[in-house]
Amino acid sequence: MMLQHPGQVSASEVSASAFVPCLSPPGSLVFEDFANLTPFVKEELRLAIQSKHLCHRMSSALDSVTVSGRPLEMSVTKAEVAPEEDERKKRRRERNKIAAAKCRNKKKEKTECLQKESEKLESVNAELKAQIEELKNEKQHLIYMLNLHRPTCIVRAQNGRTPEDERNLFIQQIKEGTLQS
């Protein structure tokens, strides 16, 4: 993306605009402008920023370094920038690995916690079902005992009920008991 100038160009003539053509006035871009960029555009911007940094380094180096009264020409290669870039990438990858491991561990702990809670609730549910069965059996036994006692109960005989009424009541309660179970 560098502009080619005819003849020899001094470092002071090289500007960032030669490397990064910009259509917007400086300071007019906001963060939201960059939020929706595609990875390809982001990569282009990253390279443009790197080129701008290299341009500033080159201009300062060319201004300060001269050999036999003329500027020393420096070629900026990928190898000069690569160690810094590689180190940054390595640090970022390392941080990403740590964050990913932390996320996996949290997810694993959450899954284990939910599994334990599920097992606990299932055992409580089984205990409650067993208790329900015990209570149903106890209810049936009490109804049976009550019905055995009814024909001989003095209190009921005084109320004017006959043993026939008691037998019908007993049959009715048995039917109700089987319908409810």
From Swiss-Prot:
Name recorded for this polypeptide: Cyclic AMP-dependent transcription factor ATF-3
Start and end residues of each bZIP domain: 86-149
Gene Ontology CC terms: nucleus
Quaternary assembly: Binds DNA as a homodimer or a heterodimer. Interacts with KAT5; promoting KAT5 autoacetylation and KAT5 deubiquitination by USP7.
Lineage, top ranks: Eukaryota, Metazoa, Chordata, Craniata, Vertebrata
Compartments where found: Nucleus
Region Basic motif, residue ranges: 88-110
Keyword Transcription regulation carried by entry: yes
Job description of the protein: This protein binds the cAMP response element (CRE) (consensus: 5'-GTGACGT[AC][AG]-3'), a sequence present in many viral and cellular promoters. Represses transcription from promoters with ATF sites. It may repress transcription by stabilizing the binding of inhibitory cofactors at the promoter.
Region (Disordered), start-end ranges: 76-97
Keyword annotations: DNA-binding, Isopeptide bond, Nucleus, Phosphoprotein, Repressor, Transcription, Transcription regulation, Ubl conjugation
Glycyl lysine isopeptide (Lys-Gly) (interchain with G-Cter in SUMO2) crosslink site(s): 78, 175
Family note: Belongs to the bZIP family. ATF subfamily.
Positions where Phosphothreonine occurs in the chain: 162
Main location: nucleus
Spans annotated as Leucine-zipper: 114-142
Biological process terms in GO annotation: regulation of transcription by RNA polymerase II
Any one Pfam family match given in the protein's UniProt record, by short name: bZIP_1
GO molecular function per UniProt: DNA-binding transcription factor activity, RNA polymerase II-specific; RNA polymerase II cis-regulatory region sequence-specific DNA binding
InterPro entries reported in the protein's UniProt record: AP-1, bZIP, bZIP_sf
